[in-house]
Every structure is written in C-alpha cells, then in structure tokens.
Amino acid sequence: MTVTRRDFVRHQALATAAAAAGVAVPAAATNIVTTAADNKLVWSKAPCRFCGTGCSVNVATKEGRVVATHGDIKSPVNRGLNCVKGYFLSKVMYGEDRLTQPLLRKKNGVYAKDGEFEPVTWEEAFTIMAEKFKKTLKEKGPEGIGMFGSGQWTVWEGYAASKLMKAGFRSNNIDPNARHCMASAVGGFMRTFGIDEPMGCYDDFEHADAFVLWGSNMAEMHPILWTRIADRRLSYPHVQVAVMSTYEHRSFDLADLGVVFTPQSDLAIANFIANYIIQNKKVNWDFVKKHTNFRVGTTDIGYGLRPEHPLQKAAKNADSAGASEPIDFETYAKFVADYTVEKASEISGVSEDKLIKLAKLYADPNIKVMSLWTMGVNQHTRGVWMNNLIYNIHLLTGKISEPGNSPFSLTGQPSACGTAREVGTFSHRLPADMVVTNPKHRAYAEKIWKLPEGSIPEKVGAHAVLQSRKLKDGEINAYWVQVNNNVQAGPNINEEVLPGYRNPQNFIVVSDAYPTVTAQAADLILPSAMWVEKEGAYGNAERRTQFWHQLVNAPGDARSDLWQLVEFSKYFKVEEVWPADLIAKMPEAKGKTLFDILYKNGKVNKFPLAQVSKDYENKEADAFGFYIQKGLFEEYAEFGRGHGHDLADFDRYHEERGLRWPVVNGEETLWRYREGSDPYVEKGKGVQFYGKPDGKAIIFALPYEPPAESPNKEYPFWLCTGRVIEHWHSGSMTQRVPELYKAFPDAVCFMHPEDARSAGLRRGDKVKLQSIRGHIITRIETRGRNKPPKGLVFVPWFDARQLINKVTLDATDPISKQTDFKKCAVKVERV
C-alpha cells in the first residue's frame, strides 16, 4: 500500500488525538467518510426520471445496481437541488414486483383472451404479437392497429416508434400520453406563433419582477423551479407573486395576490386583462404594429365528446373548431370591451379589486412579468384558447422574448417536449413541427427516411381519447401501449377505456416495468428496462436536450422499449404490410423486413459499435450491431437543422448538462424570436416570429364559453383532479418507494370544512364520491395542503386503489383533443 505525505499527516493527527484520549488505535484508523474509490462507487450524470423540469442528477452505481443519487451541482437547471421524488430515484427500479419476463394470457397452453398470464419467451411473445398485427392489417388495413406512447419515451424510442407506425405500418394511429397534458400548449403555440415550445428559458426566473401562475401548483409540481421563484421573491422586495387557481394549494403560501376563481372562468379573466390594458392606454403600440396581427376564432365548437352526445350534436362549429378569420385592432378592442371588471368578477367569483391588481401587473410597462401555467390551463375544454389568451396579454404589452418577460408553458413529463412534441409522436405530427396533412412535409420525411413517395398516409390518426373509443367499438384491434398507464390515467375509464382493452376482438400489448392497472388489463405484457438501464435522451420545458449513458442492466429478460420496437420490426416482410403499388416504387424493398427498410437503411446503422463509449454498456447497440441511438438521433436531427429546431451533434450532448435548441454554430439559444439571441431573426428586425410567413404573431378574439358539465342539484360539487409532490402520475414507480408511499399512502378527497359539516362529515370519514359515470370510495380531508373553496373537491389520481378517473368526463378541447380532468360534477356521501 502506498501512503502519501497527506495521508501520513492525516493518520498521525488522528492517532495523536486518540492517544490524548487514552485510546490505543492503529495509526491508519480513520472515522472520515471514505472516498468513492474506496467504496468502488461509479458516478455518472442523468436527467431525473420524473417531471418536465429536467433536473440533472449524479447517479452512483455499485455491483450492477444504482445505489445513490444526488442533485447535480453542475446543472444550470437545479443547481444541486432535488425534490423529494428526485432524492429517492435510486429506488424506483427496485420494486419487489418488477417485471422480468414476457407474460401472455394462456389457457391449455395457447393464447386465450380470458386466460391467465404465463411466462413466455420473447420469441413466442413477438410471434403471437406479429400474428395479431398481421391479421388486423390484412382485415382492416393500417387504421385497424394503434399505438399509445409517452412523454416518458426517450427521444430515440419515440422516433423509432413513430417511424415504425407511420412509415412501416403506414398508420398514423400513434399518440403519446402527452395528449392528456401538453396538446393544448402545442395548439396554442402553433396558432399564435406557428412554431412550438417556449420562447423563453429558466434564466427568466432571475430577471422577472412579477410571476403569475395560471392554474399551476409549482410548489408541488415543479418544486425546483419554485425554489427559484421563492429565492427571487424573498431576495428582492419589489418582486410580486400572483397565484390563480380553482382552489388554494401550497403555491398560495408565497402569493402576494391569491386568486381563486370559478372553473372555466379564466377565459373571462384573461379577456378582462386585455380590455384593461386597452382601456388604460397601456398597449405597446410600437410592438403591436410591427409584430402582430389580429384574428377572431370560431366559437360554439363543442366539447370533443362522442358525436351522438347531446352537447356535441348541439355544437354549431365542431367540424371547424380551429378556424379563424382576420380582423383589425378596433374590432378586437370592441370584442374584449365586453369583458368589464364587473362582468369578469360576476363570472369568476373574484373580487373586482383583485382582478384590477392582477391586470396592473401586466399593464405596467416597468414590471417584467413571467406567466406560468400547466394542467390548469391545458386540461381544459378551451385549453388552446386559454393559451392564446395568455399570449394575447404579453403581445399587447410587448412583454415577450426578453429576459424576465416571458409567457412560459411549463411541461409535465420529462420528455413531453423532447419526444412527444419535437419528435412528433402525435397522430398528426412529424418531427420539427411538420404534420402528416401537409404533402411537402410528408415528402420531406420520406426523403430523409429513404422511402418512396406515398409511404406516409395523409389522414390524421386517432388521438388518445379516440383510440379508446375505437378500441371499445372494435375499430382498432391490435394495440401496443408503452410507458404509460392509461387504464388508470385516461378519462371515464369504466365506460370508455377498460371496455376496449377487454373487447374480445382486440389484442392488447403493454410494455412496462411493473404490473400496472393497464398491464393487468392487457393480453401480453412485455417487461421494460427503466431509466439508466438504457442509454437515453430527454427534452425538457426550456428546450434543453439532455443525454445519459446506460449505467446498469435491466433485471431478468427485461428489455428497453427501443429494443422492443426495433426487434419487432424484424417480424414483418415489406410485402406483408405495404401495398403492391408502393413496393413498385421501391422494388429493392422486396423480400426485406421493416427492420432493413427503417433501421438498417444506411443512415441509422452508419455508426459502428466502435463509437460507443468503452466506459459504458449499450445493450441495444450490441444487439443490433451498430450504435443505434446515435444513428436514430442523427437521422432525426436532419428534420430540424436549418428549420429553427437545430440540434447539436450527438456526441456533444454526452459532454454537456444539456443544450437549448436551436443550437446553431455550436451555440444554444436562450430567447427565441429576439435579435441578438436567436440566430434565425433577420438583422434589423428586432423581433421576428418566424414561425408565421409574415413574421407576426396572432392576437386572438376568443370568448368565455361554459364547461361541458357543471354542478347541479343532484351532483352539487365540482371535482378537480391532479397530483401531489410525493407521487409521479399514476404512482406506479413512486408508490413502490417505501419512503414516498409512507409520506402519502392513499388518495383523499380534499373538501372545504363547511361543506363537510353541512353533509355531516368529519375529517377521515369514509365517503362515496360519485358522478353519473362512476364512483370511488375514499376519505374526507378538511385540513392540509389543499384548501378547496365551498362547492369544489380535489382528489389526486396516483392511487390505483381509488381510480378517480372512473368518475371524470371524457370531454376534450375540440382543437387539441386534450382531456379536461379539472371539472365535472360529483356528489359526496357517507358510506
């Protein structure tokens, strides 16, 4: 053993101290914490597995297991901090019921819809799966199959899935669970700016003078970003925080202005603020004249319900929900003039004084304002409108695309931006904001993918809620679910989700790491690798793309979703899935598999195994014989480079704590559309919203319209659902972490104390919470973190033993097709 002078001095000092205490100890003894090298811990970096904030963590592995994580002090996102979920990341992969082998429903040794799950090999699993997909394709064509993916897919998993479905199987029936959380945000961006994702970044937190939360409980849902708001607010006395919600929550603890409004009335409040700005001559005319246009949107657009629903039948413009017509400023001003403070107060239940204080924050040209929102705005039957209306306020005042002035749509999932949106795994999208309905976009994708003209269908596929309806109705018969738990997370699950999974006509495949509610409803369960058991990439809410290496192996026969997707493609010959006229355009495809055409096309497979880091394993690269993650990423990056979505070269991301796109000439972009920050803004323009042909953003005239369902005599309460800080989504990971489970083991019904007293209820009482669709049994909570107003109850949805989505309504925004989980009518009765 070699002892350095430093070690010798340290040991001598310890021995001297021990001798002084009368204790005889060896000179080399020490009570100082040993080094990572002594413990044989290997540390690496990875983005957190949970929310869209995109925190970076340091991950320690030992003997093939993740044994510790801590916040990455080098990360500009979280600066060494973690929320409570992040602290326990090392445990999410090690639940006792982790799935380790494929499971197929069988009876008497063969597949049976009503059989019991039995272990099978991957070959048997893919063989029966391919048989069912081929049968459906033959009988019903591409529209008979479907896939439901995730904002938790890695970038290359989502890209491989989209390519397999849209180009391989020629079906646009692929959608991510981000349809439930971010579709309205996408719709808002595209309508107002013509390009998706925020123009600002997290640096805005250190520059803003006021923060306005529109339906976002950041203290629990984006706690690391909330620390930056709290630090700004507590460090600078002039800074103000306004929090708007349909109920009080932990974010109200920091609020200078707390606003509790009636569900759906945020539409009226936003229009009042615009009116206040105009009436008080606070319009930034130089900005508005140079950089905006005005349009009026189609109204009376329905609620995205089934066509036979009375509300849908009554809607006059359901088929043209996203349409709009140009107007001038005077027409717009006249439109919002109807939203007086008196009217807004009457609709919202918010005092006139509070509404005026809120409007003044935006109207004052000397106050830099950051607006922030998530599910309270997006999970809304007029969610796209609400996104548009918030942008209206920032555009009227010119408070946009500069440090501290930022309308910021926060993201829920770790890669809802990077995978669902940027990759384009929605049923209507292609990468880099391209869409399947645009022939030029399809042709561009086909060129990059080296496929013949006409490979990608032009018809928009089924979105998430429509997929469930089509499964129930027998229109989709072969269905693959990855990285989501929709039988727990979807709306109106008893009537519209579960029936499709158990429909005898259908074959349902679920890829997951744990036996979730959705997995248990499947016919075939495929065990998936998690997080750092594979090499991955996520894109967060500020356009930051982050990579990680594979650090450990998945248990048993579990395999990554990427491996599953690509390996499954080997089971299909081109002749089995493509029509003859398409093959005639590419005769060399004859006899080849979809794997050969999609993933061994000379581009995806161009990077050899030698380029994989020698310090890390890569099971997928080993399996396919080339660096598949790099190949998929570089092919995908072709879509965005030169089109405002530029990504850096693959290898650079492993060296960085992420980069914010567009990355041009090696430099990331902090503020988009602003000259000097965004390389796509032409010199001399100052501001240029280049997603629109004329470089101008749109200010929309959009009215208040009532919700699809409101309380009545029989069902007197509003129901709002959501999350809590301890649990991620449906709890399939976090409820398997003992510390997180103990912190919040069971969902409860938060209720105003006076409502409880009126119903003869006390805290802890068991109750039946019921809508016209279904019910759950839960317990009343009249204290604690969430404080609903009278007439509203709040129930989190993480608890698989209390499936609150049996109660919710499957109404959606008619433009974005996103579900409204925030408002339906219920009653609460003692059991």
From Swiss-Prot:
Gene designation per UniProt: napA
Entry-linked PROSITE patterns: 4FE4S_MOW_BIS_MGD, MOLYBDOPTERIN_PROK_1, TAT
Positions annotated to bind [4Fe-4S] cluster: 48, 51, 55, 83
Upper classification of the organism: Bacteria, Pseudomonadati, Pseudomonadota, Gammaproteobacteria, Cellvibrionales
Annotated cofactor note: Binds 1 [4Fe-4S] cluster.
Subunit and partners: Component of the periplasmic nitrate reductase NapAB complex composed of NapA and NapB.
Changes after translation: Predicted to be exported by the Tat system. The position of the signal peptide cleavage has not been experimentally proven.
Annotated residues for binding of Mo-bis(molybdopterin guanine dinucleotide): 85, 152, 177, 181, 214-221, 245-249, 264-266, 375, 379, 485, 511-512, 534, 561, 721-730, 805, 822
Reactions catalysed according to its record: 2 Fe(II)-[cytochrome] + nitrate + 2 H(+) = 2 Fe(III)-[cytochrome] + nitrite + H2O
Signal peptide: 1-29
Xref: NCBIfam families: NAPA, PRK13532.1, TAT_signal_seq
Gene Ontology biological-process entries: cellular respiration; Mo-molybdopterin cofactor biosynthetic process; nitrate assimilation
Keyword annotations from UniProtKB, A to Z: 4Fe-4S, Electron transport, Iron, Iron-sulfur, Metal-binding, Molybdenum, Nitrate assimilation, Oxidoreductase, Periplasm, Signal, Transport
Keyword Signal: yes
Needed cofactors: [4Fe-4S] cluster; Mo-bis(molybdopterin guanine dinucleotide)
GO MF terms, alphabetically ordered: 4 iron, 4 sulfur cluster binding; electron transfer activity; iron ion binding; molybdenum ion binding; molybdopterin cofactor binding; nitrate reductase (cytochrome) activity
Domain annotation 4Fe-4S Mo/W bis-MGD-type: ranges: 41-97
Protein name (database record): Periplasmic nitrate reductase
UniProt keyword annotation of 4Fe-4S present: yes
Family the UniProt entry places it in: Belongs to the prokaryotic molybdopterin-containing oxidoreductase family. NasA/NapA/NarB subfamily.
